């Protein structure tokens, strides 16, 4: 049986190779409906694969998040940008998988149209669990004669060799544990055992897959018809294959009375791994602009092999004064309360998204902001706030800035006071929190209603005074 294994292949052909080549769980993939260079559609044009269900586009995502949620677009982008088809195939060869089981193209490697057998998948996942060391599968261990003499010892002939670095294996196991704890493989959990694994769903519903590991065993399961008739469209690796895998693996561990143990023992430092905080958009070392991203993207802190830690600082963020009401460059007419220093995103030449700025500008702006489609920093000055001008500035009450400042400070003070007053009754606490929310809501509006905000501030102050906090 060599039916396609679906997304179960991603750790073997995409994530582990990328990390082995210098990436990290914190590296960034672009989970966006934008073409991927080298990913061709039927007409030969650059395209991208859809995520399961057709949605799930999240913009820049860490490898860890993309694997946990099994996003196809991210996996395809990682394969084509970080690994390459030929190197991905080489890793499969090192895990004992012959060419006849490999579709050596982007679709076969990133999305699992390759037809690996359950044994091959169990061995490959076992390679990761065994600190990156492949062990040739054996159907018997030895042959002895009637006198107990060993005639054949298969362990002496067994092929063993390193495929992935131990540090790579450690990180990938950690990522796969998350896929079971909170991702697509939650139904593979075994009580009192550490479990890591990956689901797979064939694109035409002809089979579903789960491959996983514990501290004791690796195993895989495929569910499908022997005539390859399509399963129910509702069948997935997560809701069908994972629970079946869980059922027989749990029985094995209980029958052998096996205690829980880590799949790979040791600590990150044992594998020369260090924690690094890169930008959540570029994957390079974070700058102040990254921490203040105007689109709300955050930095990511995760482990990296010490010999491949990024050394370059983010080349995609630039700090500018932004009007928070329009999201564009602030002008002299923007009220000071709406002006903040934020990091905007610019796509540098050579970036995987750069060549698609013209044709997919609207999509890129949706995920990366208004400035992301500018090809020159000189163009930034043309993207100024259109909400505030001389007329709107003249209409603003002279003391609006003061009430906004007072409101912001009062909200902060209220949180501090409530947090340091454990004896408040539930009703009083609820009333104060409601008053805080009212002020915050009015502060978020554009334009700000001066009269309403003034009333909300007065109410919050009264609530705090009534509670004896002011």
Stretch-by-stretch model annotation:
Residues 23-88, 134, 146-178:
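Conserved catalytic neighborhood of penicillin-recognizing serine enzymes
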Residues 28, 65, 75-79, 91, ...:
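Structural recognition of the beta-strand scaffold that forms the well-ordered cores
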Residues 272-398:
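Low-complexity, Gly/Ser/Thr/Pro-rich intrinsically disordered linker/tail segments
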Residues 1, 5, 115-123, 127-316, ...:
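A penicillin-recognizing enzyme superfamily signal
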Residues 4-31, 66, 124-128, 172, ...:
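Active-site SXXK
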